[in-house]
Design a protein with these regions (language model features):
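Charge-dense, low-complexity polyampholytic segments
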Residues: 22, 48-54
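Aromatic-residue detector
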Residues: 1-2, 41
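A short, charged, amphipathic alpha-helix used as a generic interaction element across diverse proteins
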Residues: 30-48
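Short aromatic-glycine-(Arg/Gly/Cys) micro-motifs in beta-strand/loop hairpins
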Residues: 2-25
Length: 54
């Protein structure tokens, strides 16, 4: 995972929700809820913030 402190981006593109952890590391999800849950888990463990771009 990238350095602690960098925000985690959640955004929608081509009908998929993407979680961008930084440094090219991303995940795809079918719903905003799934993407938020994944991002929140990492953010809490690494003391990072989540930015949701709707």
């Amino acid at each position: 995972m990238p350095e602690s402190g960098l925000p985690i981006r959640v955004y929608k593109e081509n009908d998929m929700w993407h979680v961008d952890y930084g440094e090219g590391e991303t995940e795809e999800h079918t719903s905003l809820e799934e993407a938020e849950s994944a991002a929140d888990a990492v953010a809490q463990a690494e003391e990072r913030t989540v930015v949701i771009e709707e």
